[in-house]
Amino acid sequence: MAVSAPLRSLEEEVTCSICLDYLRDPVTIDCGHVFCRSCTSDIRPISGNRPVCPLCKKPFKKENIRPVWQLASLVENIERLKVDNGRQPGELAREPQDMKLCERHQEKLHYYCEDDGKLLCVMCRESREHRPHTAVLVEKAALPHREKILNHLNTLRRDRDKIQGFQAKGEADILAALTKLQEQRQYIVAEFKQGHQFLKKREQHLLDQLATLEQLLTEGREKFKTRGVSELDRLTLVISELEGKARQPAAELMQDVCTTQDTKDFANKYPRKKFWIGKAIPHMVKRKAGEFSDKLLSLQRGLRQFQGKLLRDLEYKTVSVTLDPQSASGYLHLSEDWKCVTYTGQYQSDCLLPQQFDCEPGVLGSKGFTWGKVYWEVELEREGWSEDEEEGEEEEEGEEEEEDEEVGYGDGYEDWETDEEDESLGEEEEEEEEEEEEVQESCMVGVAKDSVKRKGDLSLRPEDGVWALRLSPSGIWANTSPEAQLFPVLRPRRVGIALDYEGGTVTFTNAESQELIYTFTTTFTRRLVPFLWLKWPGARLLLRP
């Protein structure tokens, strides 16, 4: 039958540490420890001195030994309880299976030898090997270790609490971040949905206006056609009659002449009447069509600005780039911070480096890119180069167009001078010659492979490893084969260059208005660097930021 824990604890209290049996005639010594009376008589003095307690090693006097009657009574009661629990009187309770005993004596390990660091039983403690050593009770020896364990345990518990706190806070932060991302997702969907609806309404509004213009033009076309057919029929009839008169014999013709009232002017019988068919496109319709074209230009500019701004702000990282002076042509002068380049017009380099442009006035950036999305700007400084002048030119052109609308319509007898046509053609040829001269003054901005060819006359096109725009007084051109004119009158002060290496695109924008100008699309396999080319006296290019 299993022994209850309280009973086993009581048995340990009434067990003699010397004989390891129940206390028989228990007595106490000076230090307070209790032993059997017969066991105390076996304790011998050490080196002729007084005997010492086997447990605490304190000396005691045998004349001070006193009986402990209460323990004797307690032993008797425990023995009776043992009988009730199915054990014979004097039989001790079994120790827990996991409790270690002395391997030599099979006794309890009550002591700890501080010299050898071993657990001892009573018999080992009294042996010659350990008698001169310092031995203390296991409970006492365990106290400092237990205290260290408890202190370390408290530290670990605090660490656990901190980790749990950090984990809880981290989970809360992650949850808050996920919640914020979800809110941002909903915001993006809602904003784009609203934007789609707005653009859809604007699209429908423009299409409705376009349909109205188409209807007006269709109706005007029918009226114009009807009036023209009627007038043509009248003239055809008169022409046919006169052709018949012209073919008459002379006598018959003169007979008809004599029958008229005015014999001197037979043609007055067929007077030349002024006709009016009307304008093919009424002035009101032309005005509305012009206003609609202006709206489309505003739409185009607005969409370019929108695309350029999103491209720059949402996808690309703005980087600071500088120029590589060793690659600069002798026609160019670089500032001390390698951010600005000026065209000198005269070759000034004393020695030609292998990586230097010789014939072409070009220069490369010192920083290259083999991945990522990066953005930088190039500013063009030159007197007379601005978008304000562009707007002024557009206004002048608009006024000229309005004047053209007022002129060019009259009656059916309006004459056209061929000399004026020849004169205008001559003016156009002169303008083309002037444009060809202006093309010589230009600059290019973009990117190039770091291995781009730098010697001799170069085309500097995508097939040569250069993706650039050319800016000139005649407008902006994509440096492709063949060269493509993009905007004849666009004059941006700053050009934004957005490079998406993995995406294989180089996008150019008006950095001030965020308008999209042009995008090159290809596959990049080499390191790319900024590229500038300047052949424009009085102009300079600056890298921003």
Swiss-Prot record:
Chain positions recorded as Zn(2+) binding sites: C102, H105, C124, H130
Source organism superkingdom: Eukaryota
Xref: PROSITE patterns: B302_SPRY, ZF_BBOX, ZF_RING_2
InterPro entries per the UniProt record, alphabetical: B30.2/SPRY, B30.2/SPRY_sf, Butyrophylin_SPRY, ConA-like_dom_sf, PRY, SPRY_dom, TRIM/RBCC, Znf_B-box
Complexes and interactors: Interacts with TBK1; this interaction bridges together TBK1 and NEMO in order to activate TBK1. Interacts with INCA1.
A Pfam family reported for this protein in Swiss-Prot or TrEMBL: zf-C3HC4_4
The species this protein was found in: Mus musculus (Mouse)
Disruption phenotype: TRIM26 attenuatess the production of proinflammatory cytokines in response to TLR ligands, TNF-alpha, and IL-1beta stimulation. In addition, the challenge of TRIM26-deletion mice with LPS results in inflammatory responses that are less lethal than those in wild-type mice.
Coiled-coil ranges (or none): 197-243
Catalytic activities: S-ubiquitinyl-[E2 ubiquitin-conjugating enzyme]-L-cysteine + [acceptor protein]-L-lysine = [E2 ubiquitin-conjugating enzyme]-L-cysteine + N(6)-ubiquitinyl-[acceptor protein]-L-lysine
Zinc finger (RING-type): 16-57
Family: Belongs to the TRIM/RBCC family.
Modifications after synthesis and translation: Autoubiquitinates upon viral infection. In turn, autoubiquitinated TRIM26 recruits NEMO and bridges TBK1-NEMO interaction.
Start and end residues of each stretch annotated as Disordered: 382-443
Segments of skewed composition (Acidic residues): 386-440
Annotated protein name in UniProt: Tripartite motif-containing protein 26
Subcellular location field: Cytoplasm; Nucleus
Biological classification of the source: Eukaryota, Metazoa, Chordata, Craniata, Vertebrata
Ranges of residues in domain B30.2/SPRY: 301-545
Key word Transcription regulation present: no
Example of a GO biological process term: positive regulation of non-canonical NF-kappaB signal transduction
